[in-house]
Amino acid sequence: MNSLVATPPVPPHFYEHSRFSPSRSMSTPAQQSSNRKRKAEDDGNDVDIRMSASPTNSPAFTPRPLPNRQMKRSRPNVSGRPLSLPRLLETLDTDALRSVLQAVCQRHPELGDEVVHTAPRPSVSSTLQVLRNYQSTLQTSIPLGSGEYLSDYAYNRVKQHLFNLLDALSDFTPHFLPPNESQTSVSLTYLDGATDIIHSLPKWQTPRHNIGRDSAYEEICKAWVLVIREAAKRGGGIQLQYGGWDQKLAKHNETSGGKLQDAINELQNSLGWMGSSALPGVGAAGTQGGDQTSIREQLLSGTYGMGMPLKVGPW
């Protein structure tokens, strides 16, 4: 008879480990991931793993070169220094720059010749603007309520500005005369503007103070005569005929009180009968009551002879 051997009781906690767990392969996780296909979510997990990994396990980053910036290095020592020539010239106004240039040319005369040949020729508009600036300074210096003829007190106040204007006229006028100026239209345009400025010169109660004004009229009249002679040599004075200079010169002569009569006579001699009727007080025009329509204009417009009786019958 078989005897049963009593087995000792098994503790309950041993039963917790008696379950069968799924068999696991002994291969490494890297081998398992290589044996199956990669999925999109696996790539995201790998990125998370790499980002959470320690720097020692992360791949090495190759340094990229930074762009080279052209920056001025700050000077270690700050000290005062003079401005460079371009920066210095930027701070100078017109008057200061003119004074510096004149001083340099006076010290070095050879530079003056270089400036004269390098500088552009002054235009009529710029020159007349300079003269108008002198004229404006003169007009603003005249005391208020002086009347048409100014007193000696007013003359003493403005004589320096008057001399500046007269000197400028005397210096600028020869520049626009032949042979220095080859274009007659430029010369006539300047003389027209310069004569207007002379008209605005003040008149003085003391006759000797008017010498400067009378001298200016005399010089500008000689300039008109010279330019008219030069213009008459070119194309028979066609520019004088069709430019209306006969009318302008006649108006200047009237405003000056007949001080430009020599220029009027020269123009009448240059144009002959073609311009005589356009000049009041010269030739036949003086007997026609100042008729402003010249024979030249009548011929060009085709109205010459209209209104005149036509003779019929034997001559």
Curated annotation (Swiss-Prot):
PANTHER family: FI02826P. Residues 20-34 have a biased composition (Polar residues). Binds the proteasome. Involved in ubiquitin-mediated protein degradation. Regulatory factor in the ubiquitin/proteasome pathway that controls the turnover of proteasome substrates. Targets proteasomes to the nucleus and facilitates the degradation of nuclear proteins. It comes from the Eukaryota. Transmembrane segments: none annotated. Disulfide bonds: none annotated. It is found in: Cytoplasm; Nucleus. GO terms for cellular component: cytoplasm; nuclear membrane. Residues 1-83 are annotated as: Disordered. Belongs to the cut8/STS1 family. GO terms for biological process: nuclear protein quality control by the ubiquitin-proteasome system; proteasome localization; protein transport. Keywords: Cytoplasm, Nucleus, Protein transport, Transport. GO terms for molecular function: proteasome binding. This is Tethering factor for nuclear proteasome sts1.
